[in-house]
Amino acid sequence: MEKALNFEQYVNLADPKLGAEAIFATDDFFADKSRLIRTEAAEWKEDLYDDNGKWMDGWESRRKRSEGYDFCVVRLGLAGTIAGLDIDTSFFTGNFPPSASVDACYSPDGEPSDSTEWQEILSSQSLQGDSHHLHALDNEQVFTHVRLNIYPDGGVARLRVYGRPSVNWDQIGIDQEVDLAAVVNGGRALACSDEHFGKKSNILGPGRGENMGDGWETARRRTPGNDWVIVALGRPGKIGKVVVDTAHFKGNFPDSCSIQAAYVQGGTDDQVETQSLFWRELMPSQKLSAHNIQEFVEQVNDLGAVTHVRLNIFPDGGISRLRLFGFKSE
């Protein structure tokens, strides 16, 4: 029996926003390989056709009339360990592959070649049409590329590769300031009160948000209380500066925010939600403004090394990015 896995607590290493790219496919006659890893969920366009037939939101090969099978190679945006996979056949009904498997390799200095050694990380699995196929993995190796094999042909809407980025913290000096929460540094959004309009993981992404959808936004709160999100830092460290970016949030930014933090030892990711109610105050409540980058330094309390933070927003609304600058601890 496969272990249970909360996929939302991991990073999609195959996200184009992190630099991932579908670099090769044996055939993508009906639907371009680049669509296999699009950030957005797959969609159906009823009356859209192109020169090769029905437009499909995913990767689709032509009907195979010879021996063999099709595959697509994806360069991950961030090298890392892979905890789970989602092979998504949304809207592929009469044209999905009967089965698929996934291989991975470590090729940090360039693209894989004919001599590259691939390792099977998911054996051949039966697929259903218009379905998500979630598979938890137990593998601690670091990979840079994955290869989706489909037997013998057909279409897959999306491939999600959930894992943890591999960060060489030895290359970061003890006196070098770094964003401890950034996804590229291993930061992960673990839990939140609500993410009706935008996913919690967006606040740790690179750069500024592209639009309002590229942030974390909650539904309008109609009951007492406030919304919150919990973040695991990529490395324990001392936080000295907080940056809250409300880019594109103009009529729906939070009135204010505060941050709690703790050095969590032991337990699981799922247990921190209850613990977070009692964490110490890293930053007392601060007013926020629309479509603005706000930096807080003097307002940040010295808590020493911490591993997790809880961002509280009052009462609800949207945040584009959260940056937690500090120094790694030994």
UniProtKB/Swiss-Prot annotation:
Catalytic reaction equation(s): allantoate + H2O = (S)-ureidoglycolate + urea
Keyword Hydrolase recorded: yes
Pathway as given in its UniProt record: Nitrogen metabolism; (S)-allantoin degradation; (S)-ureidoglycolate from allantoate (aminidohydrolase route): step 1/1
Signal peptide: none
Entry-linked InterPro entries: Allantoicase (IPR005164), Allantoicase_dom (IPR015908), Galactose-bd-like_sf (IPR008979)
Any one Gene Ontology molecular-function term assigned to this protein's record: allantoicase activity
A Pfam cross-reference name: Allantoicase
Gene Ontology process terms (BP): allantoin catabolic process; purine nucleobase metabolic process
EC number: 3.5.3.4
Similarity comment: Belongs to the allantoicase family.
HAMAP family noted in UniProt: Allantoicase
Cited NCBIfam families: allantoicase
Designated name of the protein: Probable allantoicase
Organism expressing this protein natively: Photobacterium profundum (strain SS9)
Lineage: Bacteria, Pseudomonadati, Pseudomonadota, Gammaproteobacteria, Vibrionales
